[in-house]
Design a protein with these regions (language model features):
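Regulatory nucleotide-sensing modules
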Residues: 1-20, 24
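Short beta-strand segments in beta-sandwich/barrel cores
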Residues: 8, 26-31, 49, 73-74
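Surface loops and adjacent helix of pleckstrin homology
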Residues: 14, 32-34, 55, 79-80
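Conserved beta-strand and immediately adjacent loop positions that scaffold enzyme active sites
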Residues: 18, 28, 40
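Short alpha-helix-to-loop micro-motif enriched in aromatics/charged/Gly
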Residues: 34-40
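Cyclic-nucleotide recognition modules
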Residues: 40-82
């Protein structure tokens, strides 16, 4: 699947039931502070997985928003808890 710059893979608070492999492009992991400033906490690049690991592993709502930094292609891997 292809994502354009600025497209969100996941929003903070969404269930995290997937991970993906980055074929091209890159992604940033963003959290917002109480004064609405953006804080980048991580990146995923070509050849890496893009996933909010703690929330994926423990089946919790996402703690971060994951955003494409450029046109990017990923391979999705889904998991059904339960």
């Amino acid at each position: 699947m292809v994502y354009c710059k600025g497209d969100q893979l996941e929003r903070e608070g969404d269930p995290a039931r997937w991970m993906a492999f980055v074929e091209s492009g890159c992604f940033k992991y963003v959290n917002r502070s109480s004064d609405d400033r953006e804080h980048i906490t991580w990146f995923s690049f070509v050849g890496e997985f893009v996933v909010d690991y703690p929330t994926f592993l423990y089946d919790r709502p996402s703690q971060t928003t994951i955003v494409a930094m450029m046109t990017s292609r990923i391979l999705w891997l889904f998991y059904n808890f339960g």
